[in-house]
């Protein structure tokens, strides 16, 4: 990651968090060798990069009422998005913005109404170029809505008073792979602001500074993906080459940039712990990469929880 950390390695404290109800995960981390830096300006809708994370919920209205009762920092009331679905926005103590959306697929029950991430909102400079990237490389081939306006559902979000084009994308085909049952489906909303000149969210900052630093995908066949990205004009900018050993887990990771420089990470998992206490590890290279792991095996990951 030296190209994105000022050319020097840095130490950090990282936590990987998942919700076994379903959805993606978060890698939450903090530099320990330097002070993480915020953006030098107030972020606004349409700024280039990952502006907001979409969180799935079984009941969006109930989630809104719960978070309101907990005095969460809500940015909007319960509203309808351009597609007519219930949604709302809030921010965490560090200013990171989250959107709560209706989840369409679930892995487990869970104690909360919300699951894990189910996509994000990304600011772009050229909608056609970005749609091509997310369709050709990441497979988001279905347009849910494509509208241009000053959007009332975003009133309360910085920069939402500007005219913008919003395009929500999803996959037409179910996801495949070892973790597909857990990770589930996702949607990407691309936003291009019409009435202002946006800025790059990570301008003059490092990967790992405050904010959403990249979007990560679990993938199979890294070599084929490398050729696909290169042919599309987006070659890997970082490549761990073969297997990267992380102690209890191992895999191969790489990065590409979208047309505006937003970082996309690809991870091909080779080994994960199922039950560390008894030394049970799963070597994913020895199985059919397209088939999902059995539910009971994924649920066993809860025994690796670090408290």
Predicted regions and their residues:
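N-terminal beta-strand motif that seeds the catalytic metal site of vicinal oxygen chelate
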Residues: 48-55, 101-131, 137-154, 158, ...
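A short, acidic/glycine-rich surface segment
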Residues: 1, 35-40, 105-108, 150-155, ...
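Vicinal oxygen chelate
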Residues: 6-33, 37-66, 86-90, 116-126, ...
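Short, structured interface segments
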Residues: 27-31, 85-110
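A common structural junction motif
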Residues: 70-75, 141, 232-237
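Generic structural signal for well-ordered beta-strand positions
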Residues: 96-98, 143, 264
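Core segments of cupin and vicinal oxygen chelate
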Residues: 1-23, 69, 79-81, 123-185, ...
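C-terminal functional regions that serve as terminal interaction/effector modules
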Residues: 170, 175-176, 182-194, 207, ...
């Amino acid at each position: 990651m030296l190209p994105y950390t000022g050319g020097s390695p840095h130490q950090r404290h990282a936590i990987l968090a998942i919700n076994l109800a379903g959805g993606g995960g978060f890698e939450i981390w903090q530099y320990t060798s330097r002070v993480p830096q915020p953006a030098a300006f107030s972020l606004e809708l349409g700024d280039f990069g990952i502006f907001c994370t979409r969180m799935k919920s079984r009941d969006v209205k109930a989630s809104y009422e719960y978070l309101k009762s907990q005095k969460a920092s809500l940015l909007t009331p319960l509203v309808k998005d351009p597609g007519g679905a219930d949604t709302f926005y809030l921010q965490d103590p560090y200013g990171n913005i989250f959107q709560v959306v209706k989840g369409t697929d679930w892995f487990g029950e869970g104690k909360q109404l919300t699951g894990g991430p189910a996509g994000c909102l990304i600011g772009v400079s050229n909608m056609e170029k970005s749609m091509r990237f997310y369709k050709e490389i990441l497979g988001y081939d279905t347009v849910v809505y494509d509208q241009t306006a000053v959007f009332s559902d975003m009133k309360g979000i910085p920069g939402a008073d500007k005219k913008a084009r919003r395009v929500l994308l999803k996959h037409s085909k179910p996801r495949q792979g070892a973790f597909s049952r857990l990770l589930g489906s996702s949607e990407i909303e691309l936003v291009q602001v019409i009435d202002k000149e946006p800025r790059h969210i990570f301008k003059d900052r490092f990967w790992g500074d405050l904010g959403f630093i990249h979007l990560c995908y679990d993938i199979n066949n890294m070599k084929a993906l490398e050729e696909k990205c290169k042919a599309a004009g987006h070659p890997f900018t970082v490549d761990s080459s073969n297997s990267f050993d992380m102690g209890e887990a191992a895999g191969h990771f790489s990065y590409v940039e979208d047309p505006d420089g937003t970082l996309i990470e690809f991870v091909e998992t080779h080994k994960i712990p199922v039950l560390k206490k008894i030394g049970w590890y799963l070597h994913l290279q020895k199985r059919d990469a397209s088939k999902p792991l059995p539910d009971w095996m994924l649920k066993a990951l809860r025994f690796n929880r670090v408290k």
